[in-house]
A protein has these predicted regions:
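A short, histidine- and acid-enriched strand-loop-helix "catalytic/donor-clamping" loop
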Residues: 129-148, 160-163
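Donor nucleotide-sugar binding/catalytic pocket of nucleotide-sugar-dependent glycosyltransferases
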Residues: 155-199, 205
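A conserved mid-protein helix/loop that constitutes part of the nucleotide-sugar donor-binding site
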Residues: 33-37, 217-232, 249-252
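Conserved donor-binding/catalytic core segment of Leloir-type glycosyltransferases
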Residues: 21, 201-221, 227-231
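Aromatic "clamp/platform" in nucleotide-sugar-dependent glycosyltransferases that forms part
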Residues: 291
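Short alpha-helical donor nucleotide-sugar binding micro-motif in glycosyltransferases
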Residues: 270-271, 278-283
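Short hydrophobic beta-strand element within catalytic cores of glycosyltransferases
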Residues: 308-312
């Protein structure tokens, strides 16, 4: 039994309908909100419970503090965890097999790909449990393009799945690549776990020109690229004020380079969710130079704070939100292009206002309610008439 888990968190209610079970790597702030909403809707539908089984209490590179679940039941599976990098983790939790046998779910949701998900998929096949596979991934970030073991794992998990769930058409393309019929894919958008407590402030009340928010690494988040863009703006005669929220291996390098250049830069380190509204509302422009985020909820956090975004095309949010809906600027990862684009956005208040208006039109489609509705649309055919 996982530490802190009660028997009621693990075993189904014998008097009620069989539960829905989600197997995931680790809880995140937005998935906690999602599962609370999904649990509420399932309970209201037919009294069905939602159980969430995590492979690890928390990813090592994350510092999120998660509130305890109120409406869904959560347990952490014992097993092996390899922290391969700041963004890559490998989970092997064979305990998922007896746990699923005890829970006897009416439907199973597998959140992404790992050996643990393969164990769960095998158990579901043996017990004829209908399975949904969910991924944030898009073709550009799919490791199956380059790795035969990754391709095999994904095909083994996706093959025969009842449906797929993801936040973008790109996620549907990834699942289709591994055998899911396209008509079985259902959109369930990603969304911020918080909403701004007040209307966004005007630009005149924002003390910083540029904001970076995320893990301070180069291989995924592009933190060194961000540094080069800031220094490039200075070389064009524009010493900008900068705020950096987050931590990681490049922090010392970034601090030193900005200090040597005589630039005003504030480094907050890691911040909890409660501090984020003030952070995002403190800058006139948010830079998201991602080199491979599967999505990028930080983009939506900036947009809902009235902060326009300049992003790379190498993320789900860059292509599936900013580019698709014209609510942000997307540029190739070329420093000179980003310097020019950033300065143009900072100098053109009407352009920033146009981007804000476009974001206001599209963000209502990227909410917790819309995400829950996507899950329910995928689950309803599986739960109809099932005890």
């Amino acid at each position: 039994m996982a530490a802190g888990a009660r028997p009621s968190d693990i075993l189904p209610d014998a008097s009620g309908p069989r539960p829905v079970v989600v197997v995931t790597g680790a809880l995140a702030p937005y998935t906690h909100v999602l599962y609370e909403g999904l649990a509420e809707r399932l309970a209201g539908r037919d009294g069905r419970a939602l159980h969430v089984l995590s492979c690890t209490p928390r990813e090592r590179a994350r510092q999120w503090v998660m509130p305890p679940p109120r409406l869904y039941r959560h347990a952490v599976l014992p097993g092996l965890r390899w922290h391969r990098s700041s963004i890559r983790n490998l989970y092997v939790n064979p305990a998922v097999v007896p746990r699923l046998a005890a829970l006897r779910p009416a439907a199973l949701v597998l959140n992404d790909f790992s050996p643990t998900m393969l164990f769960a998929r095998g158990a579901a096949r043996l017990r004829r449990i209908p399975t949904l596979v969910r991924t944030d991934g898009v073709p550009e970030t799919d490791p199956g393009q380059r790795s035969a073991p990754h391709r095999w794992l994904r095909r083994a998990i996706v093959s025969g799945a009842a449906a797929g769930i993801g936040p973008s058409a790109g996620s549907g393309a990834v699942l289709a690549r591994y055998g899911l019929p396209p008509e079985r894919f259902v959109l369930s958008p990603l969304f911020p776990a918080w909403t701004p407590p007040a209307p966004p402030p005007p630009d005149s009340a924002r003390p910083y020109d540029l904001l970076f928010c995320g893990m301070l690494n180069e291989e995924v988040k592009g933190a060194r690229f961000f540094t080069e863009v800031v220094l490039g703006c200075r070389d064009r005669g524009r010493p900008l004020s900068v705020r950096v929220a987050g931590d990681g291996p490049l922090r010392a390098e970034m601090e030193a380079r900005f200090a040597q250049a005589g630039l005003s830069a504030r480094f907050d380190g890691f911040l909890g969710q409660e501090a984020l509204p003030e952070v995002y509302a403190s800058a006139r422009l948010f830079l998201f130079p991602s080199r491979g985020d599967v999505w990028g909820i930080v983009v939506q956090e900036a947009l809902q704070s009235g902060t326009p975004v300049l992003a790379s095309p190498h993320s789900g949010a860059g292509r599936g939100l900013l580019e698709a809906h014209g609510c942000g600027a997307v540029r190739p990862m070329v420093v000179a292009d980003w310097v020019a684009a950033a300065l143009r956005l900072l100098d053109d208040g009407s352009l920033r206002e146009d981007l804000r208006r476009a974001a206001e039109r599209v963000l209502p489609h990227f909410t917790a309610e819309a995400a829950v509705a996507g899950y329910l649309a995928a689950l309803e055919p599986l739960l109809h008439g099932r005890p």
